[in-house]
Swiss-Prot record:
GO terms for cellular component: HslUV protease complex. The gene is clpX. This is ATP-dependent Clp protease ATP-binding subunit ClpX. It comes from Thermoanaerobacter pseudethanolicus (strain ATCC 33223 / 39E). GO terms for biological process: cell division; proteolysis involved in protein catabolic process. Residues 1-53 form the ClpX-type ZB domain. Keywords: ATP-binding, Chaperone, Metal-binding, Nucleotide-binding, Zinc.
Length: 424
């Protein structure tokens, strides 16, 4: 408390009240502040902090807006996009809401994406993070092992997210983590074994806490944890985990369950070939995942299951041409920088889609196929003069003929003059 000076009565530099009008007067270099002004300043700071907390990730887009954004980058998968849009909206709405302790508790809902290789699982997760402007990290479940064994600890997944957020922990705590190949950590058999399953059930057990929400200790340099190192602490309660996997063979499990129920007098039994794979996957239930090898506790922490359809030829052609960052648009831009217009004819695009289907790589394999086709073209074109247009035809894709080249008027005139001279 500031000492009283008989010659000059002390006053608060903010409100002007004298020392005898307030409980406390704190002195600084040439200034004074009373307890009432300190309390008022504290209230202002608290209000601003609460406003910042309310803002969360900014203005949260509605489910329809989320789906419209996904439509720009992801072709097909309408049902999956709708389900993801609702799930993500509800997740971030839960984070942004200020719920009283005695109110209804909104539980966290992580997502499981189930679909064939190259159907768009990773792209969906990446695009969501891009729209919401939150940190995003991808982890491969196959590299994870239970603590104490050779491989990565599950906490290293969180380190990737922290790095994506430039070590801003508060920002990372609202990020998205995509765990790929989650089906590869399925339990090796339905019956518990004497030998420890360190890369299967053990990893599922290790993931449980971070999926549900916990204060995790993350080694700043990655690698294994040891007692004498410092840790980064991160709360995983509001991190959205999206797990993806092909779950090859799960359709047989679903079929056997549905088949048994449908059997009876006059029941029509269809063979697997007659059934559509996407239709079978749409009937997935938690018990099917359990039989596949996922443990009950893991299934409980990933309650939203979204199935993706296998991509058709038409889907692959659309993927090549329609999205904002479509592969053909990327090649067109590269050629445009050399002053050449690039075109793909419809038959060529159809053939590229057929090749991807044959390789069973889905949309992921399109880039590799295009690189094979375009290598010689991209090698020759920059060194050739006066080329106006390059057309990739069906024969080019089959490597039976080079692309059709259209030359500029100046080059055509030059060729015409040479031809006339040779005739004369």
């Amino acid at each position: 408390m500031a000492k009283y000076d008989n010659q000059k009565q002390l006053k608060c530099s903010f409100c002007g009240k004298t020392q005898d009008q307030v409980k406390r007067l704190v002195a600084g270099p040439g200034v004074y502040i009373c307890d009432e002004c300190i309390e008022l300043c504290q209230e202002i700071i608290n209000e601003e902090f609460e406003e910042d907390m309310d803002m969360g990730i900014g203005e949260l887009p509605k489910p329809k807006e989320i789906k419209e954004f996904l439509d720009q980058y992801v072709i097909g998968q309408e049902k999956a996009k709708k389900a993801l849009a609702v799930a993500v909206y509800n997740h971030y709405k839960r984070i942004n809401s200020r719920i009283k302790p005695d109110d209804v508790e909104l539980q966290k809902s992580n997502i499981l994406l189930l679909g064939p290789t190259g159907s768009g699982k990773t792209l969906l997760a990446q695009t969501l993070a891009k729209l919401l402007n939150v940190p995003f990290a991808i982890a491969d479940a196959t590299s994870l092992t239970e603590a104490g064994y050779v491989g990565e600890d599950v906490e290293n997944i969180l380190l990737k997210l922290i790095q994506a957020a430039d070590y801003d922990i508060e920002k990372a705590e609202k990020g998205i983590i995509y765990i790929d190949e989650i089906d590869k950590i399925a339990r090796k058999s339905e019956n518990p074994s004497i030998t420890r399953d360190v890369s299967g059930e053990g990893v599922q057990q290790a993931l449980l806490k971070i999926l549900e929400g916990t204060i995790a200790n993350v080694p700043p340099q990655g690698g294994r944890k040891h007692p004498h190192q410092e840790f980064i602490q991160i709360d995983t309660t509001n991190i959205l985990f999206i797990c993806g996997g092909a779950f090859e063979g799960i359709e047989k499990i679903i079929e056997s369950r549905i088949g048994k129920k449908s059997l009876g007098f006059g029941a029509e039994v269809q063979s697997r070939k007659e059934k559509d794979l996407s239709e079978i996957l749409s009937h997935i239930m938690p018990q099917d995942l359990l039989k596949f090898g996922m443990i009950p506790e893991f299934i409980g922490r990933v309650p939203i299951v979204v199935t993706l359809d296998p991509l058709s030829k038409d889907d692959l052609v659309r993927i090549l041409t329609e999205p904002k960052n479509a592969l053909t648009k990327q090649y067109e831009k590269l050629f445009e920088l050399d002053g050449v217009k690039l075109e793909f004819d419809k038959k060529a695009l159809g053939l590229i889609a057929d090749m991807a289907l044959e390789r069973k790589t889905g949309a992921r394999g399109l880039r590799a196929i295009l690189e094979e086709i375009m290598l010689d073209v991209m090698y020759e074109i920059p060194s050739s003069d006066n080329i106006e247009k390059c057309i990739i035809t069906e024969e080019t894709v089959l490597k039976k003929a080079p692309p059709t080249l259209v030359y500029s008027d100046a080059q055509k005139a030059k060729k015409k003059i040479k031809k006339t001279e040779s005739v004369s």
